[in-house]
């Protein structure tokens, strides 16, 4: 009987899958880490889904490397690859301790070059003044991005029904993230005339153009300014200018960053006044 139990235990060790190993390891490891760290492990595990149902004794070096190679093909960052390697390393170290596996190949994985991330650049006051001087529909779009902090996708999805002219604010109904949906952004007094004109001149969407068309004109205007900005630099500029003067919670609310329980977001007159006060700090 004892010999049978030993054989059965060995067989179970030989058939445990990577998914089963993860589900066994995470509850133990999560006792000493933050919720955000637990979430990052779940995200990393999704990248190894191709081998997650394989018995760990059948997973060799090339299986690991193929996971990393696949991430490169998808254009994922060095940081993402490193997080996956870290997770695999922890899992197989745990497997060795539990006598499920005898080899950890992760230290030999090649992650590829660590290419620096894009350095965002802030629009200068001189560049913003030149945008006002250019005075075209596309320079107006860039100014609206600068004074609202909207993502370009959010701007292109704005409809007339999202603009509350009497109260002088807009509502973002189509956002990149759930945290950004339904947020209120007061309209700065300098861009209110631009919004009013768009409201009068359009039928449904404020900007009836594609991203490709806008991107082309954006690059043309950047040439006029003799600078190399990306569209996202407008949002970065908005955040940077307000970061030093606006309360952190107010800035997160304007940018649509997650804070607390987003399902219970309630705007009061006081909240909107605080948002407007922050927006008007922009010059």
What are these regions (language model features)?
Residues 14-18, 26-94, 98-100, 208-212, ...:
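N-terminal core-binding DNA-recognition domain of tyrosine site-specific recombinases/integrases
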Residues 57, 102-103, 166, 171-173, ...:
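Major-groove DNA-contacting interfaces characterized by cationic-aromatic clusters
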Residues 82, 97, 101-103, 107-152, ...:
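Basic, Lys/Arg- and aromatic-enriched nucleic-acid-binding interface segment
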Residues 1-15, 31:
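N-terminal helical hairpins
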Residues 148, 157-195:
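Conserved tyrosine-mediated DNA breakage-rejoining catalytic core shared by Y-recombinases
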Residues 133, 185, 199-208, 215-260, ...:
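Short, basic (Lys/Arg/His-rich) helix/loop patches that form interaction surfaces
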């Amino acid at each position: 009987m004892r010999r049978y139990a030993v054989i059965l235990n060995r067989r179970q060790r030989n058939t445990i899958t990577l998914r089963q190993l993860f589900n066994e390891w995470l509850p133990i490891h999560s006792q000493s880490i933050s919720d955000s760290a637990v979430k990052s492990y779940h995200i990393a595990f999704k990248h190894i889904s191709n081998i997650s149902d394989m018995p760990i004794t059948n997973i060799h070096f090339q299986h690991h490397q193929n996971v990393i190679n696949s991430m490169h093909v998808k254009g994922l960052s060095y940081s993402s690859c490193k997080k996956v390697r870290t997770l695999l390393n922890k899992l197989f170290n745990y497997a060795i301790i539990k006598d499920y596996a005898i080899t950890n190949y992760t230290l030999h994985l090649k992650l590829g070059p660590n290419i620096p991330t894009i350095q965002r650049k802030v629009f200068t006051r001189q560049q913003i003044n030149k945008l006002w001087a250019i005075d075209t529909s596309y320079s107006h779009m860039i100014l609206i991005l600068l004074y609202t902090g909207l993502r370009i996708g959010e701007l292109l999805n704005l409809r007339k029904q999202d603009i509350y002219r009497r109260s002088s604010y807009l509502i973002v109904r189509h956002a990149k993230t759930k945290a950004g949906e339904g947020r209120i952004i007061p309209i700065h007094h300098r861009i209110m005339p631009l919004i009013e004109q768009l409201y009068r001149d359009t039928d449904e969407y404020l900007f009836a153009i594609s991203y490709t068309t806008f991107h082309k004109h954006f690059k043309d205007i950047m040439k006029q300014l003799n600078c190399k900005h990306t569209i996202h630099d407008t949002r970065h500029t908005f955040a940077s200018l307000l970061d030093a003067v606006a309360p952190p919670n107010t800035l997160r609310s304007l940018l649509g960053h997650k804070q607390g329980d987003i399902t219970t977001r309630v705007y009061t007159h006081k909240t909107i006044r605080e948002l407007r006060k922050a927006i008007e700090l922009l010059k």
